[in-house]
Swiss-Prot record:
Bias (Basic and acidic residues): 143-152
Family: Belongs to the RTC5 family.
GO biological process: response to oxidative stress
GO CC terms, sorted: cytoplasm; nucleus
Biased segments, Acidic residues type: 167-177
Source organism of this protein record: Pyrenophora tritici-repentis (strain Pt-1C-BFP) (Wheat tan spot fungus)
Positions of the UniProt region annotated as Disordered: 143-177, 305-328, 488-512
Claim: Cytoplasm is one of the keywords in the record: yes
Protein name as catalogued: Restriction of telomere capping protein 5
Length: 624
């Protein structure tokens, strides 16, 4: 009886209106609510006395490009979120209250009302808004996953504590009660939990996101990643050419492949949560500023509003200043690897505030030359984080050139397949690996440099991220011959003197190079690269957390086509680098201008000392 009375006391419509009122009171300022009201009423359609937004109106207001075909996906998300906290009422008509809830959730302003584990539960709501519920499809999908798990050999266990740190998390279906924590917390404040628990829970584990819908959404997210709350989508991408659309689609396919959709009809919640949490934590960030547009009432046509005694006059309408002109473009100049689309892909796991309008091109192999010396000259003076990108094609199994044979001789016999599987050889064969290096580059002595924020990643043909491990700190190295390993890379320890001597004794011409369990190595000619991934881990970087790659070992040996380094930082870092380069140039010019040629070494040395080029101990000057 008590439950029944509570359900009668909180009918569905009242529950929906009450939560909308709570969001309005606690999540927005009065000015923001006024702007939202102006936006809604100026564009709303009316039928049977109900004001609402249609799919066409929503897509036109957000300026969603027709070329991406994503309007129906966004409208589906909005229709589901508009029914919050009652999923059985979805799809909801986008009335004032429903659309206010959509904006609250997608701009992540619900925290003032719902404080418990907000981000994690928010991700569940995003999944639900994209998913379809079909137990038949879901059961078939689970059977396929179980069959695949039988075929994948279990990773070899080890007593080494380092491997325990690296062991990929199997994930958890989670308690059913946790699925609705956001909803329960919201209703708890209204004493309506019992009403909700009787028939209002939806099980995310009986659903999937259709691949095509997810692909279209990811294309949009790639496009809007750099958008500002006061920037319209039409100004961000005024000319969405066929070339750009194809570029967005290719990148979206790469990202979608990380969800293992090649062998499945869609994305399950377990896979969605695992991939987003580990490899794409900022994927949905662009939705926040996009839906913030509802809170800026600039240039709105209020002619459709009916005047009334309490209606604000035109003069009382708040004046929202136009967005400030950006002093910097999103990306000053594209590289051979890095363009706007790849930059957006990077922003899905590196903070966009460190990337957009903050990157400077430091080094390009095809511009500055593929040599360690050129790399050092262009990169070492950048005293801020850098992003290294390398692109190439797989080497043939049998070496065809002297250099390829030398690489093969340097490495142990190849025991693992490449990451490009035989059934995908006809599609994307381009390999792109990279790294985020937080420390300034330097010559490697006895130990590597870098810290736990150093990150390895793959951008093609699959999106994957390999974060730093606590087991080992061999993050980054830059070593010239005869130091081994000669070249640059991440994740391989510098051998001790005794180990290096032992390696030389086994091979007089080519010491064997043994890459770390998860590592990237570029040879000292910057001609070839090797990426190694062992699922057992145990090195400086954690193995892949992608469910589709669970237990997988691979090694990609490829010829480098393009190599780039980009500096993260503002004008102040670039100015410091310019000052350092200018100082080095002055030092070199001073050496050239000293008139030597007396034939007397002591006199020549005294002249250099007088010029301040060298000190009394015969060494060159320093920056002090």
């Amino acid at each position: 009886m008590e439950t029944a009375s509570r359900r009668d006391h909180f009918p569905n419509q009242q529950l929906s209106q009450t939560i909308a009122q709570r969001f309005a009171q606690k999540s927005f300022t009065p000015l923001e609510l006024y702007c939202f009201n102006c936006v809604f009423r100026s564009l709303a359609d009316t039928e049977s006395g109900v004001h609402y937004w249609s799919e066409t109106t929503l897509c036109r207001f957000l300026e969603l490009p027709d070329a991406l075909g994503v309007g129906s996906v966004i409208f589906q998300m909005a229709s589901y979120l508009g029914a919050f906290p009652l999923p059985s009422q979805a799809p909801a008509i986008l009335t004032y209250e429903a659309l206010l809830k959509v904006v609250t959730i997608l701009t992540e302003r619900y925290g003032a009302v719902v404080k418990k584990r907000g981000r994690e539960i928010w991700l569940r709501e995003i999944y639900r808004s994209l998913a379809i519920y079909d137990k038949g499809i879901r059961s078939s999908l689970e059977d396929k996953e179980k069959e695949k798990e039988k075929d994948v050999p279990a990773p070899v266990s080890s007593g080494n504590m380092g491997f325990a740190v690296d062991a990929p998390d199997d994930g958890d279906e989670g308690d059913e009660d946790e699925d609705d924590e956001l909803v329960l917390a919201a209703l708890d404040s209204m004493d309506a939990i019992d009403a909700f628990k009787h028939g209002e829970q939806s099980n995310v584990h009986h659903s999937i996101i259709p691949t095509d819908n997810f692909l279209k959404l990811v294309e949009l997210l790639l496009l809007i990643a750099p958008i500002d709350a006061q920037q319209s989508l039409s100004t961000l991408a005024p000319d969405l050419s066929d070339t750009r659309v194809a570029e967005l689609r290719r990148a979206a396919h790469v990202i979608i492949s990380s969800f293992g959709v090649e062998n499945h009809p869609g994305v399950t919640y377990r896979t969605f949560n695992a991939v987003i949490s580990t490899c794409l934590p900022y994927l949905f960030n662009g939705l926040n500023p996009l839906f913030e547009h509802f809170l800026f009432a600039k240039d709105m046509d209020l002619s459709k509003r009916k005047g009334g005694p309490n209606s604000p006059t035109k003069e009382s309408k708040p004046v929202i200043p136009p967005p400030k002109a950006q002093s910097e473009p999103i990306l000053r100049e594209p590289g051979e690897i890095l363009n706007l689309t790849i930059l957006s892909q990077l922003s899905f796991f590196l903070k966009g505030s460190d990337l957009f309008r903050r990157l400077r091109p430091l080094y390009s192999g095809n511009t500055h030359g593929f040599s360690m010396g050129s790399f050092e000259k262009q990169v070492f003076n950048w005293r801020a984080p850098t992003i290294l990108l390398v692109k190439g094609r797989l080497l043939p199994t049998t070496p065809s050139t002297t250099r390829e044979r030398a690489l093969q001789d340097m490495l142990p016999p190849k025991r693992h397949p490449s990451s490009i599987t035989p059934d995908s050889l006809s599609s994307n064969q381009t390999l792109i690996y990279g790294a985020y290096i937080s420390s300034q580059w330097k010559h490697t002595g006895k130990t590597c440099f870098g810290d736990a924020s150093t990150t390895l990643f793959q951008l093609s043909p699959t999106h994957d991220v390999f974060t730093a491990s606590a087991f080992s700190h061999d993050y980054t190295y830059f070593s010239k011959s005869p130091t081994t390993p000669a070249g640059l890379g991440l994740g391989t320890p510098i051998p001790t003197q005794s180990a290096s001597h032992s390696s030389h004794s086994h091979s007089h011409s080519h010491p064997v190079f043994r890459p770390g369990p998860v590592s990237l190595h570029l040879d000292d000619a910057l001609e070839f690269a090797v990426f190694t991934h062992l699922a057992e881990g145990g090195g400086s970087f954690l193995p892949s957390k992608l469910p589709a790659r669970k237990g997988s070992d691979w090694q990609d040996r490829f010829e480098i086509e393009s190599l780039e380094v980009w500096g993260c930082g503002g004008d102040e870092v670039a100015e410091e680098q310019r000052r350092t380069w200018a100082w080095e140039e002055r030092e070199a010019e001073a050496r050239r201008r000293v008139n030597l040629g007396t034939g007397d070494q002591e006199m020549d040395r005294e002249l250099l000392k007088m010029a301040g080029v060298i000190s009394g101990d015969r060494s060159g000057g320093s920056m002090g």
